[in-house]
Structures are given as C-alpha cells and as structure tokens.
C-alpha cells in the first residue's frame, strides 16, 4: 500500500501509518518546512521505519510528487487543507497522484475551521473530480472521505 501524507510535520501520523502499511508499504510524507522533515527522518530512523518513508520538502506551489501520478492508494490531509494557499492546485496534485479508485481523507479541526469553510473545501474537491463517499466526524475534527473515480 502507498500512502501520501501532505503536511506531515514531524510525523505524528506518519510513523503509525508506516507501521500499518507493513514492510512492503510506502509513505510519501511531504512538508513545507525542512526542519519538520529533518525531525521526521530522525524519528523514523530511531523507530526503524525510515526504509518505508520517503520524506519530501516541498514548496507551496508544488508538492513535489508529480512523478508518482496514479501510484498512490490513499492520501491523508489531516488538519492541513485550511493552511494551503492554493487549495485547488493542492487538490489537483493529490488527485493526479492517486490511482483510479484511490481515496483522500480530509479532516479539519472543528475549533479552527467552521463547517461552512469545510463545505467549501469539499465542494472544491468535488470540482477537481473527487466523489464524496462518506462523512468523517471525530470529537475535534470533521471532514470527508473522497474517492478518485475508477
């Protein structure tokens, strides 16, 4: 399984995801901040998971994974989309990276992103080509699971 995690930070979700994907799995972890990627790499090395993680420093106009078109099974945008300057470009790049039938989980913090803003983000994702397949609600987060049509 291949997982894309844009906005990975120091790997709060990255390391558990790498464990779950197993030895054959791959996590492509992307962040704007080199210091975050450096911290992620250190933590992954200590945990013995570095071989399962590809850590990429990107910029805000290019996520740095265009060479993976159609190769990603699932992407996780956890508490990140509201921080992205060009959300359409971001969603288009994620869409292109996903294989047909691949999924994107968008979660946003309830206390920071009101439902109306989330609805706008999800509508934009649908305009890019995603289909909404389920609502995702957690005590502190809300979002949706989306799918790239097969």
What are these regions (language model features)?
Residues 1, 61-75:
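A short acidic, Gly/Pro-enriched loop at the edge of an enzyme's catalytic core
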Residues 1-9:
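Conserved class I S-adenosyl-L-methionine
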Residues 10-22:
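Conserved SAM-binding loop of SAM-dependent methyltransferases across substrates and taxa
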Residues 19, 88-100:
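A short glycine-rich, Lys/Arg-flanked "PGG" loop and its adjoining helix->strand segment in the class I
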Residues 33:
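Conserved SAM/SAH-binding beta-strand->alpha-helix loop
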Residues 49-60:
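Conserved SAM-binding strand-loop segment of SAM-dependent methyltransferases
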Residues 72-85:
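A short SAM/SAH-binding and catalytic strip from SAM-dependent methyltransferases
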Residues 101-108:
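Conserved beta-strand signature within the Rossmann-like core of class I S-adenosyl-L-methionine
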